[in-house]
């Protein structure tokens, strides 16, 4: 303990014996070093730092304008599970694309004949004509996951290869997704004439049932997602031209369609 105390006293005495001029010289040297500008040494010469302009600090207004340099070996530049995230993103994109393709891919729109429901018969004695108001029905089935529009319907009635009546209309109906819809329309047909036996046959009281065969060709245009298709049906029906009737019997059906 005695030796440590004596050495401490000796050190203090040496400090007191130091020359005050040496202490002033040391302070001047520290201040000179503190005022020395911040520079970058490239080996042969030095370049003043462009960021702080040698001041050793960054102005507050430039804090949001400067970019920090990160070493290439920094772990922040190597995110974990990158491959898993990329693979998951690719799978999700493929799944979404497949679902969009499945739901938006155009499916068939089926048009079927549902028969003749009502036949109204009137006679024109002056011109020897049998006037038939034929009400037919189409069954349209939409298999898509979006609505389709029936934009045009055209029907033509023939008897013995002669056109005796026609009907056309636009903006018929809008069919909901995955559903079917019945479309009714009435065609007026005039059969007979002065040189025809039809009027005599249909008005002959000795015959109980006055059946004639009419031929109908019906075309339907359907629009969906910028795509237009056309279906054509050709049917033949038995019609009693002597009296008004309902639910006329179909002879056979020849479907044609859809056509692009």
From Swiss-Prot:
Keywords: Endoplasmic reticulum, Glycoprotein, Lipoprotein, Membrane, Myristate, Transmembrane, Transmembrane helix. It is a multi-pass membrane protein; Lipid-anchor. It is found in: Endoplasmic reticulum membrane; Membrane. Interacts with TMEM106B. This is Transmembrane protein 106C. The chain crosses the membrane at residues 85-105, 196-216. InterPro entries: TMEM106 (IPR009790), TMEM106_C (IPR048509), TMEM106_N (IPR048511). Pfam families: TMEM106, TMEM106_N. Its main location: endoplasmic reticulum. A lipid is attached at residue 2 (N-myristoyl glycine). The keyword Lipoprotein applies. GO terms for cellular component: endoplasmic reticulum membrane. Glycans are attached at residue 184. PANTHER family: TRANSMEMBRANE PROTEIN 106B, TRANSMEMBRANE PROTEIN 106C. Belongs to the TMEM106 family.
